[in-house]
Swiss-Prot record:
It comes from Halalkalibacterium halodurans (strain ATCC BAA-125 / DSM 18197 / FERM 7344 / JCM 9153 / C-125). NCBIfam families: PRK04435.1. Gene3D superfamilies: 3.30.70.260. This is UPF0735 ACT domain-containing protein BH1214. Residues 70-145 form the ACT domain. CDD domains: ACT_PheB-BS. Belongs to the UPF0735 family.
Length: 147
C-alpha cells in the first residue's frame, strides 16, 4: 500500500466543489445537519462530488490539532494535588480522556493521563512545563502521542 502524501493548499486555490465539501462536512460534524443529503443540499453540492472529495479534503486545524497524548506524572501524595494538576489541564482547554492513578506508596503516586489536545490553547510542551512547575509534581513524561 502506498503512503498518501498531503499538501497544504490555501483555501482560495481549492475548487468550488472542494470548498463546498468542507462546508458540508462541517455541517455534519457540528450536528447542524444529520444527513449527507441535507448538508450537500444546503451548500449547493451534488452528492457525487461530496463522495468524491470527502475523504481527501480536511481543514488544516484537523490535520495539525487532532492529537491524543499520554502523560505519565509522578505526584506527591498531598491533599488537592491531583485536583490542582487537573485544573491546570482544564485551564489549557485540553480534554482528559482517561485518567489512571496508582495507590500512593512512600508518599508518591503515578498518574497516567490521556488527553485530547484538539481544542487546547497551549502547545504540548507548554502544558508539560506548566504541570512540571507545580509544587507537588516531581516528574512529567510524554509517553505517547498520536491522532
Amino acid at each position: 500500500m502506498t503512503r498518501k502524501k498531503f499538501y497544504l493548499v490555501r483555501e482560495d486555490m481549492l475548487t468550488e466543489a472542494m470548498q463546498k465539501t468542507l462546508e458540508a462536512k462541517a455541517l455534519l460534524e457540528s450536528g447542524k445537519k444529520r444527513k449527507i443529503n441535507e448538508a450537500v443540499h444546503e451548500v449547493g453540492l451534488s452528492r457525487s462530488a461530496f463522495y468524491k472529495y470527502k475523504d481527501g479534503v480536511f481543514p488544516f486545524h484537523t490535520m495539525t490539532k487532532e492529537k491524543i497524548i499520554t502523560l505519565s506524572i509522578n505526584l506527591e501524595d498531598r491533599s488537592g494535588s491531583l485536583s490542582a494538576m487537573l485544573a491546570t489541564v482544564a485551564e489549557a482547554e485540553a480534554n482528559v480522556l482517561t485518567i489512571n492513578q496508582t495507590i500512593p506508596l512512600q508518599g508518591r503516586a503515578n498518574i497516567t493521563l490521556s488527553i485530547d489536545t484538539a481544542t487546547m490553547s497551549l502547545e504540548i510542551d507548554e502544558l508539560v512545563e506548566k504541570i512540571e512547575s507545580m509544587e507537588a509534581v516531581e516528574k512529567v513524561e510524554l509517553v505517547g502521542s498520536g491522532s
